[in-house]
Amino acid sequence: MPLVAATRSLGRAGLFSLTVLRGSTPTADFLAELTREIYKIGARSLPIIAVGGAFVGLVLTLQGYRTLTTFGAADALSTLLGLSLYRELAPVLTALLFIGRAGSSIAAELGLMRATDQIKALELMAIDPVAKAVAPRFWAAVLTVPLLTGVFCSLAITASYFEAVHVLGLDNGVFWSALRNSVDFWDDFGVAMLKSAIFGGTAALVASYVGFHAEPTIEGTSVATTRAVVNASLLVLIFNFVLSAMLFQ
């Protein structure tokens, strides 16, 4: 039955997550692998995050300015930008871009390890494959996605500033003062970082679980990669709603 299968999969995913946490022992090998994964899934995601952030800022500024000028409230443009970015758009869009760039890579790598019997080889050598191959990827995602969200916000606000002030003619002081007065460090920026850490961990766990349990074939790896991106993206959107409902009451 579909319900039984879904419940079984959910239970396996929960046990897999506990295994990842249990295997997160900060040994020298673990820290070395963690550093490599931070570079692979974090630093290499910077270009797409930077470009995405800049163009989201430009689009928000353009559409927001047109809407606000209708009501004579163009001075509130940076308020709209800051609150929408930090509270919702930046964490979610960064996570979705991260899933497309790094989540698919994690699922494909682990699926290929399954297809080429590398996971079995680790088990035969009495090495926990989850601790070796999954835990560093999980913690790398938890650490890097908040940093990527910060980059996304910085580029979005910078691009918005240049468009609003130098193209649309908004006053420089008004832009920055409205942004400073509307965005709270803990309530807005802190929530963005919290969301990003949760989204990063969710993306890594889903991609790792699906890739780790993929069919040991090339087709199975392809299916697992697609499933990882879809499932992780849906969970990020669901968790974002739940967190927003809890944190912004």
Question: Predicted regions: what is each one?
Answer:
Residues 48-63, 242:
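Hydrophobic alpha-helical transmembrane segments of multi-pass membrane transport/permease proteins
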Residues 25-51, 230-233:
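Membrane-interface helix starts
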